[in-house]
Amino acid sequence: MKKKVLTLTVSKQWFDMIVAGEKKEEYREIKPYWVARLFQNNSNIVDVQSLASCLAGRTDLLKGYIDANRIVLKPYTHVLFINGYRKDCPRIEKEIDSITIGKPKKGLCPDKWLDTEFFIIKFK
């Protein structure tokens, strides 16, 4: 399989935990931007860009489209974590294990997120 990298910017706190091996998953909000960034069309019926706007806040509908195989994850194989926006900022690349929808784990995100569903990017 050809290597395809998903690039994510993270704060120093989470970056340091990833480097230390203490954090094995990263979270992204279920918003139109991330639906369009993580998924691709699997039929001529669904336009991912339009669908992303319609599904804002509707994880039940999004899961239905995924379960019906109408949209599929883009074939990302690795995630590149970057701490900052400069050219010389710290970075680390990890192999992606899976991308799912679920609730985050305590200690791996701000506590206010614990009761909310997110895209969970699990890595090795």
Task: Describe each PLM feature range.
Residues 3-124:
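Structured alpha/beta reader/binder surfaces that contact nucleic acids or chromatin modification marks
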